[in-house]
């Protein structure tokens, strides 16, 4: 598949760099399961889907859950024992402060 070829080319060009692949369904995950990647981003999946993906991955690489995760459903994702969890809610409503330091 195209994603397999892409991963293999990236690995050849940058053997020391981490490769992180985003997948949004189990079929996509199965396509890359035998590839050498460091992290798979499981995007917009339910906790049940994340748990199923973790069974398929079986420790081959780290997995990060992201998308539609918020402070209300965070515990459900944490219970899956996924390696990483991203919560966009933390940064979506942030107001930045622009300041400078003059010496």
Where are these regions (language model features)?
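Glycine-rich tight-turn/loop motif centered on a GG-T
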Residues: 15, 38-39, 60, 99-103
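Short secondary-structure transition/capping segments
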Residues: 65-73, 93-95
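Short, flexible coil/linker segments at or flanking structured domains
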Residues: 7-9, 17, 62, 73, ...
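Glycine- and Gly-Pro-enriched alpha-helical subdomains that act as flexible
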Residues: 1-49
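Catalytic cores of alpha/beta
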Residues: 27-38, 45-59, 69-87
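General beta-strand structural signal in soluble alpha/beta enzymes
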Residues: 21, 42, 65, 86-87
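Short beta-strand/loop segments at the ligand-binding rim of alpha/beta enzyme cores
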Residues: 12-20, 53-68
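Flexible C-terminal active-site loop/helix
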Residues: 77-103
């Amino acid at each position: 598949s195209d994603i397999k070829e892409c991963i293999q080319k990236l690995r050849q060009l940058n053997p020391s760099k981490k490769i992180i692949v985003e997948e949004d369904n189990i079929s996509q995950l199965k396509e890359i399961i035998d590839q050498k990647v460091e992290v798979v981003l499981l995007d917009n999946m339910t906790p049940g889907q994340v748990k199923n993906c973790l069974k398929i991955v079986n420790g081959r690489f780290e997995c990060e859950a992201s998308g539609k995760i918020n402070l209300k459903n965070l515990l459900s994702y944490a219970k899956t024992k996924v390696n990483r969890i991203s919560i966009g809610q933390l940064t979506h409503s942030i107001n930045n402060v622009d300041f400078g330091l003059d010496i």
